[in-house]
Amino acid sequence: MKCKPNQTRTYDPEGFKKRAACLCFRSEREDEVLLVSSSRYPDRWIVPGGGMEPEEEPDGAAVREVYEEAGVKGKLGRLLGVFEQNQDRKHRTYVFVLTVTELLEDWEDSVSIGRKREWFKIEDAIKVLQCHKPVHAEYLEKLKLGGSPTNGNSAAPSPPESEP
């Protein structure tokens, strides 16, 4: 564990920072996704998520992060996958699907850092994410391919093809 001013970073045994995020959808049709402005670059959009706290489960961390960053509550759905980022930082992010049921007018990050949120059609969200956060665009690409816990996990190798 390492400490940031307001947070304890947690790592898995392989040295990956443990993170959780949600693709927050306006409805169960999953055709509009909520993105939030980056805290570092307010003109860039990202998928809400962040580091897991000690003893926190991925699903609880995902719900907490979207509440803090996007000011939403909702119905937590499936685990879309576990995504690894190795280039600049070693992150392992559990990404869940959440259907939004409540939008808070003011929320923690809107008040403290002026964070914004906006609904995007899936294709538009992929375009805005690909420039600055390509791994976030991957979440939506997997969703478009019918991502669900039954068809694989981005961090796990694919099973070998069986011979006919």
From Swiss-Prot:
Tissue specificity of this protein: Predominantly expressed in brain and is weakly or not expressed in other tissues.
Note: Nudt10 and Nudt11 code for identical proteins, which gives their indidual characterization difficult. Thus, most experiments do not discriminate between the 2 proteins.
Summary of the function given for this chain in its UniProt record: Cleaves a beta-phosphate from the diphosphate groups in PP-InsP5 (diphosphoinositol pentakisphosphate), suggesting that it may play a role in signal transduction. Also able to catalyze the hydrolysis of dinucleoside oligophosphates, with Ap6A and Ap5A being the preferred substrates. The major reaction products are ADP and p4a from Ap6A and ADP and ATP from Ap5A. Also able to hydrolyze 5-phosphoribose 1-diphosphate; however, the relevance of such activity in vivo remains unclear.
Record flagged with keyword Ligase: no
Residue intervals of the Nudix hydrolase domain: 17-144
Catalytic reaction list: diphospho-myo-inositol polyphosphate + H2O = myo-inositol polyphosphate + phosphate; P(1),P(6)-bis(5'-adenosyl) hexaphosphate + H2O = adenosine 5'-pentaphosphate + AMP + 2 H(+); P(1),P(5)-bis(5'-adenosyl) pentaphosphate + H2O = adenosine 5'-tetraphosphate + AMP + 2 H(+)
GO CC, one annotated term: cytoplasm
Keywords of the record: Cytoplasm, Hydrolase, Magnesium, Manganese, Metal-binding
Residues annotated to bind substrate: 9, 17-19, 38-40, 89-91, 115, 133
Keyword Ubl conjugation: no
Name of this protein: Diphosphoinositol polyphosphate phosphohydrolase 3-beta
Cofactor(s) needed for function: Mg(2+); Mn(2+)
Active site: 68 (proton acceptor)
Gene of this entry: Nudt11
Entry EC no(s): 3.6.1.52, 3.6.1.60
